[in-house]
A protein has these predicted regions:
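Short, ordered coil/turn segments that flank beta-strands lining enzyme active or ligand-binding pockets
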Residues: 269
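Canonical Radical SAM [4Fe-4S] cluster-binding loop centered on the CxxxCxxC motif
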Residues: 2-42
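Radical SAM/AdoMet-radical enzyme domain recognition
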Residues: 44-62, 71-194, 203
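Cysteine-centered iron-sulfur cluster-binding motifs in ferredoxin-type domains/subunits
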Residues: 11-18, 67-70, 261, 317-319, ...
């Protein structure tokens, strides 16, 4: 295999805060064993060994949770030692960690900088929005702690971006959120529509995002971003940049814009491997790294079946004039009824593209020239 990317869950779903919308904690109920115990160094070393057994050009390691910093800094120092031990062919490596930032301190930041980690830091736009859903176990907001972490990352020149979960509480505050993040010195922003609990009816929670909510948010965010873009002052927003890339190259870099799922190689704390962190259930478990190498797991019949499920686009999608920009989006946002597949936010995205397409084309032409 030329390139391989792994998404490692060393602490399973355990976390030091209690976000109301946490989809990964919700997935515990889809596994007989629920939340796994924390990852051992033996399992971590085996993961690294397995990756370098099959990767010939590039290896990416992404750590997520739960909250992965709960493993402690020494765990990641051991990880770096293992990569040096097993990367005998000196292939390219990329390291990333997604965190709420609360445990970050000087030592963490020095380590992350020295080892070229990209940090994904969770923060929902403004303190007021963030502190509605991203709370501690005693119901206190976390924004002050996260902003302190942002300042630390900036002080030590650690590369990072902000992960912004868009909920109902944020739908009419896109411009306010953009300005706040920009004033914080944020350069990269990823927006992620909130997920309803697995198996629940859509819009069943106080934080749930309606179709109109997402439309308002995206259109407002695009307006302020576009005005900054034409003045070369924009915060880079992954979703908008992927739309432009799709127009230019016919394909984005986000898996949700590729038309079908791929195997993300999610590795849980006990060594179980899953195709995607939205599908970490017993039903979708591909096997365990103690029993199989990664090539066997990634090309297993279960993995092929998982990918095949996502190809089942409805005819409405293939007839849509925006199909090349959306391609049905991520199936986790879809409605499934007797194997029928349609993105819940289909009308939302159509209205968004109707509103923005002329400007998107202008940007794409500017990039192309």
């Amino acid at each position: 295999m030329k390139n391989i990317s792994t998404l490692i869950k060393p602490i399973s779903s355990k976390c030091n805060i209690n976000c109301k919308y946490c989809f990964y904690k919700d997935e515990d109920k889809l596994r007989k064993d629920g939340c796994f115990e924390k990852m051992s160094l033996k399992t971590l070393e085996l993961i690294v060994k397995r990756v370098f057994e099959v990767a010939t050009n590039q290896a990416s390691f992404v750590f997520q949770g739960g909250e992965p910093t709960l493993m402690g800094l020494s765990f990641y120092q051991s990880f770096i030692s293992f990569t040096k031990k097993y990367n005998v062919n000196n292939i390219k490596t990329f390291f990333s960690i997604q965190t709420n930032g609360i445990l970050l301190d000087k030592d963490w930041c020095i380590f992350l900088k020295e080892n070229n980690f990209l940090v994904g830091l969770s923060f929902d736009g403004t303190p007021e929005i963030n502190d509605i859903n991203r709370i501690t176990y005693d119901n206190k907001g976390t924004s002050n702690l996260v902003i302190n972490s942002i300042r630390l990352l900036q002080k030590y020149n650690v590369d990072f971006n902000i992960l912004f979960v868009v909920s109902h509480d944020a739908y009419n505050k896109a411009k306010e959120s953009y300005k706040y993040c920009k004033n914080l010195g944020i350069e990269y922003l990823q927006i992620i529509p909130v997920l309803d609990p697995f198996g629940n009816q859509k819009e069943s929670e106080s934080y749930s995002l309606s179709k109109k909510d997402l439309e308002i948010f995206l259109c407002d965010l695009f307006d302020i971003w576009y005005n900054d873009f034409i003045n070369n002052k924009e915060v880079r927003i992954t979703y908008f940049e992927n739309i432009i890339t799709s127009l230019i190259n016919g394909k984005g870099t986000m898996c949700s814009m590729n038309g079908l799922c791929s195997i993300e190689t999610v590795i849980e704390a006990n060594g179980n491997v899953y195709p995607c962190d939205f599908y970490v259930s017993d039903k979708y478990c591909l096997g365990n790294i103690y029993d199989n190498n990664l090539k066997e797991l990634i090309f297993s019949q279960k993995a092929i079946d998982f990918i095949s499920e996502s190809i089942n686009l409805k005819n409405d999608c293939t007839k849509c004039k925006y199909c090349n920009l959306c391609i049905g989006s991520c199936k986790r946002y879809s409605l499934n009824n007797k194997n029928e597949y349609k993105n819940y936010y289909c009308e939302t995205y159509q209205n968004f593209f109707n509103y923005t397409l002329d400007r998107i084309i202008k940007i794409a032409k500017a990039y192309s020239s």
